[in-house]
Amino acid sequence: MNAKILVACANGAGTSLMMKMTAERVTQKLNMGVDKIHHCALSEGVSSARQYDIVFAPLNFLNMYEDAKKAGVIVIGLRNVLSDAEMEEKLVESGAAEKFSA
């Protein structure tokens, strides 16, 4: 099974694009199957999060994704949104790396 991943930041422009590139590197390193990685602003992310398997957002905005979390989406908050190491650690801790193993 391949994952659909959403990465969201405040404006959905530069930082979320860099988060997307980080997610691409990390999921490849973990040998995860990924159908798509979409980047957007937090507001778009909140309304579309249920359509994804995994959502990455800054830690201080995590509460905005409670509905998605209740619906079974793996919601991951990041302290440093551009850290490969943190993203990798959180994917492993959450079980997502194993669940979506290629």
Which stretches of residues belong to each language-model region?
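A short, aliphatic-rich alpha-helical micro-motif
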Residues: 48-50, 70
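Short acidic active-site motifs
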Residues: 41-48, 64, 86
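Short, Asp-centered acidic motifs that coordinate Mg2+ and/or phosphate
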Residues: 54
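Ser/Thr/Gly-rich flexible loops in soluble cytosolic domains mediating phosphotransfer, phosphorylation
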Residues: 74-102
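Glycine-rich nucleotide/cofactor/substrate-binding loop typically near the N-terminus or early
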Residues: 58, 66
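Short glycine-rich anion-binding loops that position phosphate/pyrophosphate groups of nucleotides
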Residues: 11-12, 60-62, 81
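Conserved active-site segments centered on acidic
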Residues: 2-43, 51
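Structural signal for conserved beta-strand scaffold positions within catalytic alpha/beta enzyme cores
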Residues: 39, 57, 75-78
